[in-house]
């Protein structure tokens, strides 16, 4: 089976790079997006196993991205972890109401982040998503030949 795929959505190139390096050490393929609309396109194109999603983004905020993703039945159990500098109770509740699975605050501990991501990626639902993605990618390759 192929490596799990995590979509990291953050407008900070530094945060994207730190998360990417952290997860690549765990043999996780990382796809990045710097704004909301690019993130939605990446969800459709890459079929990630998990999304790490900032809240404050250009073109569409993380709450709205989460709501759009959750409207698609294919992504109803896709883990979405909001990763934000906003640490108030209201922000966390708003994230849950938008459909996030979990909420972590920045600055984050790299080890804790990797453990949290791996916990979701090791679930039976994640393995099922990975198998569906692999079948989808094989179908795309056959159509290109």
Tell where the protein language model's regions lie, with residue ranges.
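Active-site beta3 strand of CheY-like receiver
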Residues: 46-52, 57
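Short hydrophobic/Thr-rich beta-strand motif most characteristic of the beta2 strand and flanking loop
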Residues: 27-34, 42-43
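CheY-like receiver
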Residues: 122-145
